[in-house]
Amino acid sequence: MDCSFITTNDLRRMFKTLDKNQDGLVTLDELLWILDKLGWAEHTPDELELIVGKQSLDLDEFLRFYYDAVLDSKGSKKNIDVVADNDEAIARAFNVFDVNGDGYISAEELRDVLERLGFEEEAKAWDCGRMIRVHDKNLDGFVDFEEFKNMILHV
């Protein structure tokens, strides 16, 4: 699995992990938990309910919420595999992976974020260092914003 960005399949696995009672729904509390892990918990539960309009989301609604609200893209139910194409949305995604805020993504930061998202086993198996090397065009051992942006726009 390519770990260069959060894919729809990754989101499906996150949804399954969050759906602890396996009822096919993710509650607002579970949604707030994942937003907090991503560093995007800027809303109270009441505010989130106003945004979402209900107490829980099914898988399609969860995917749309992620792409519409988190990445500010125009994903739809039929075409949900959308990667944000504007600098602001890409910067927000970059900042999730740039854990220490130094302007660079290291293999360790990538691995840490994957683990925070509930992909502990996959993060150990994936070669995040190789992914960094593939997209590290200036060969400094990190992915900077421009390299990240080029990676996202050319996937």
Swiss-Prot record:
Ca(2+) 1 binds at residues 19, 21, 23, 30. Ca(2+) 2 binds at residues 98, 100, 102, 104, 109. PANTHER family: EF-HAND CALCIUM-BINDING DOMAIN CONTAINING PROTEIN. GO terms for molecular function: calcium ion binding. InterPro entries: EF-hand-dom_pair, EF_Hand_1_Ca_BS, EF_hand_dom, EF_hand_pair_protein_CML-like. It comes from Arabidopsis thaliana (Mouse-ear cress). Potential calcium sensor. Residues 6-41, 85-120, 130-155 form the EF-hand domain. Gene3D superfamilies: EF-hand (1.10.238.10). It comes from the Eukaryota. GO terms for biological process: cellular response to hypoxia. Keywords: Calcium, Metal-binding, Repeat. This is Probable calcium-binding protein CML44.
